[in-house]
Amino acid sequence: MSSAEMGKFDISPDEDSSSYSSNSNDFSYPYPTKPAAMKSHYADMDPENQNFLLDSNVGKKKYETQYHPGTTSFGMSVFNLSNAIVGSGILGLSYAMANTGIALFVILLLVVSILSLYSVHLLLKTANEGGSLLYEQLGMKAFGMPGKLAASGSITMQNIGAMSSYLFIVKYELPLVIKTFMNIEENAGHWYLNGDYLVLLVSVILILPLSLLKNLGYLGYTSGFSLLCMVFFLIVVIWKMFQIPCPMESDIINATLINATLAPFADENITISDACKPEYFIFNSQTVYAVPILTFSFVCHPAILPIYEELKSRSRKRMMNVSYVSFFAMFLMYLLAALFGYLTFYGRVESELLHTYSAFLGADILLLIVRLAVLMAVTLTVPVVIFPIRSSVTQLLWAGKEFSWWRHCSITVVLLAFTNVLVIFVPTIRDIFGFIGASAAAMLIFILPSAFYIKLVKKEPMKSVQKIGAALFFLSGILVMTGCMTLIILDWIHTDASDGH
């Protein structure tokens, strides 16, 4: 895309849009909009100086000004939005299915995808009525500084969660790659096989120098490369399902021992076949992580408005069609990845699917290629995620100040150090998916779009079907966030108590 700056904005009303209401104040915050990891589409700009903000034209009932016309085709917009949706969450979907069952997982996946689409609808309509294509600015117009802080904080948390999940992948996968290259069968205690040390090394040697750049020229390439990596990952997951036998050797050994010691009269085949029997409905202590993992996987909302801005022949209906195609494609991709991963390992799936293969296959050339591709993608993407967080902090604390290398470097080092501490001390990637999915993702999908819609869309009364639907959506978001967070914290407490014994 040739330009990231919008001067003024004019949207011709589509079928379901009417008059535009504008607040009485003008806002001109040069606030950058960047999606989360693997979710950015602006390769030729300085992220520190982006400005998607629209200048309000107060006093007119209809929001009419000049605007930068979109130049991105429908197909490329679908590709960009697919980039914004897909991410590391795909690695945790098989784990979610293993703890919900196939049928319950499909129901939850369908519900979350539909609700996410409804959220996109609310967000686009609110942007039209509120006269802004910036998520944080909608919060400012709706609720003042608290609204802006809520939007900015949610996006920052989501980005930190995404960044942590990518470094978790480095922590999990890089030791396995080194073991394969060095032909080491067992972990002999070498420091270079310790994931914590490797995360620190990668962060200091590769990620930090890239993060200190003022402009990331490779931004667009990273986004496309990451999507290709995930498609390749899906193909390998499907292929390996037909190659890995069930029952596995470990299942046969365990079944033999159990029958020999506990039930010598039992039919051994029943125990072995149970390990390869799919479940359709499962409820256990880990089931609570399914909804946060799914919401984490479908968060793309900070990228919706920038993609809408660049869409050729822009209209809300056309952007919703882009969303339908993208969400349907990602729905199929997520479903296939989760299903074939689950049908390969059943109840033995770990919270990061790629790591599960190493426990059963050891050194495998195809998996090694997948690991290298994924590691390269996440390493190049972490600096992309740091940019919007750093810009957000700069705008909140030092708005209007001239660029300072000292401030630029200090914020970068603090962010990267904080994320490394999380990755080293948080036990599993499941906890990152769960906590961020239940908090920031729930805010971005459920709570904020509905709250902005209720506040900014003035032409519809509160008793209208649209406003009632938005209010129910808001309440469901509160319920999802509080319920999942409560159950996750209780699971953490129970796990700590069990470990203490």
Curated annotation (Swiss-Prot):
Glycans are attached at N254, N259. Residues 1-77, 125-159, 211-218, 309-324, 388-408, 453-467 are cytoplasmic. GO terms for molecular function: acidic amino acid transmembrane transporter activity; alanine:sodium symporter activity; amino acid transmembrane transporter activity; amino acid:sodium symporter activity; L-glutamine transmembrane transporter activity; neutral L-amino acid transmembrane transporter activity; neutral L-amino acid:sodium symporter activity; proline:sodium symporter activity. GO terms for biological process: alanine transport; amino acid import; amino acid transmembrane transport; amino acid transport; glutamine transport; L-glutamine import across plasma membrane; L-proline import across plasma membrane; L-serine import across plasma membrane. Inhibited by N-methyl-D-glucamine. Inhibited by choline. Allosteric regulation of sodium ions binding by pH. Symporter that cotransports neutral amino acids and sodium ions from the extracellular to the intracellular side of the cell membrane. The transport is pH-sensitive, Li(+)-intolerant, electrogenic, driven by the Na(+) electrochemical gradient and cotransports of neutral amino acids and sodium ions with a stoichiometry of 1:1. This is Sodium-coupled neutral amino acid symporter 2. It comes from Gallus gallus (Chicken).
